[in-house]
Amino acid sequence: VEEYKKSKQKRVPKIDSHLHPDMTFANFIVGNSNRMAQNAALLVSTKPGMNFNPLFLYSHPGLGKTHLLNAIGNKAKETNPNLLVRYITSKDFVDEIINSIKTNTTDEIYSYYRNLDILLIDDIQFLFGKEKSSEMFFHIFNEIINNNHQIVITSDKMPDELQGIEERLISRFKSGLSFGIDPPEFETAKAILEKKIENLGNTDLIITDDVLDFMVMNYCNDIRSLEGQLKRLFFCSIMESTNYIDMNF
């Protein structure tokens, strides 16, 4: 590991990682539903390309895949700022490939990606039916793996359930480590909600326990929806000029 780190110290990053700085391991709430995925993500962030490559994380939307992808990148950059890391959605990847074809810069795009230390690609299912983009990704994937660099992929389905993506890519996804993320159990969802309230920055806001429990029971299957309901409550509290929210609000 030390030799790996030293070999990177001389390199100067020349790219924007496109990471969300607020998505870290420190503010990722861990429970039984996501513990294995979080442990694997933390491991590859500190030892990229060493053993578990690619890492494939899957779940329904809104359960933390994007957060973990960014946490990997942020932790890796914190450990070694010279690492070349890129977070990108598969939709944006497709757009980049299309643009490179139009501008005759596919060689530059290929060189750019193959030299990354860590590629974090979100929602790989949207490569469905994109022949040229899939071809480019296949070759980039092979180069990164062969260079002992790290790829982390997320999807709304496990590899075997992906439709419209070439079998050779599916086979490579399955060659690494895969973990699913389940909807959070009640305690984890409530802890996530409490963290979201803390992040609002309004220390005077009081939301009673029965309101929190009601929100969790109705929206725990989708953390984004849970967060959306919290923001709605926060907005309404501002409109009503109150910092106290109970079931009568």
Where are these regions (language model features)?
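Conserved catalytic/switch belt of AAA+ P-loop NTPases
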Residues: 128-129, 134-157, 167-172
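Pre-Walker A (pre-P-loop) alpha-helix and adjacent loop at the N terminus of AAA/AAA+ ATPase modules
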Residues: 19-55, 74
